[in-house]
Amino acid sequence: MKILFVLISILYAVYCFSSEEDVDSAYLANELEPVEDINSEQYAALEPKEEQERSCADMGQDCKDDCDCCLNIATCNCWFGRYFCSCTFGDYQTCLRKKGKCKRNRPQSCPRSNLNRKKG
């Protein structure tokens, strides 16, 4: 049974390689026509636009202070004092600090966690 399985595997591998070579040689001989994109004319007129710099940084991106981070509860976490700073998750207190300190990217509301509230 094992020998039969090995023989079938070898035959299948040979078949796959030979059919791939046929397609490659037919394409090189221009026997197969390349597929044409129907919408290529639509996108040809559009010029790629340069990405504009965002006013705030997403999580994991470089920052200088808490006001650079996009999320309300995001804080600017720095390694070795002021080096290698990036935006990370903060907490409710971070949001309150940003509300009082930041002029740009100022939080409108600060989300509170439901974990500490008593039920009943």
UniProtKB/Swiss-Prot annotation:
Keyword annotations of the record: Disulfide bond, Knottin, Secreted, Signal, Toxin
Signal peptide residue numbers: 1-16
Chief site of localization: secreted
Top-rank taxon, per record: Eukaryota
Location in or out of the cell: Secreted
Entry comment describing in which tissues the protein is expressed: Expressed by the venom gland.
Protein name per UniProt: U13-lycotoxin-Ls1a
